[in-house]
Curated annotation (Swiss-Prot):
Belongs to the SEC61-beta family. Disulfide bonds: none annotated. Component of the protein translocase complex. Heterotrimer consisting of alpha (SecY), beta (SecG) and gamma (SecE) subunits. Can form oligomers of the heterotrimer. This is Preprotein translocase subunit SecG. Residues 55-60 are extracellular. Keywords: Cell membrane, Membrane, Protein transport, Translocation, Transmembrane, Transmembrane helix, Transport. It comes from Archaeoglobus fulgidus (strain ATCC 49558 / DSM 4304 / JCM 9628 / NBRC 100126 / VC-16).
Length: 60
């Protein structure tokens, strides 16, 4: 059975990915918005667009 040379060690993990993870771990100030808020904002925006289209005569 062939063995790996003694001088070679396992390759270390990529440093770039470690840097990205460290960047996201350092981020403390975040705007936290619940999924329900995003859904409600989308529905309100859609209804507002429909109402404005009907009011200004753009409704087919």
């Amino acid at each position: 059975m062939a063995k790996a040379p003694k001088g070679k060690a396992k390759t270390p993990p990529l440093m770039s990915s470690a840097g990205i993870m460290r960047y996201f771990e350092e981020e403390k100030t975040q705007i936290k918005v619940s999924p329900k808020t995003i859904l409600a904002a989308g529905i309100v925006t859609g209804v507002l667009i429909i109402i404005l289209n009907a009011y200004y005569g753009l409704w087919p």
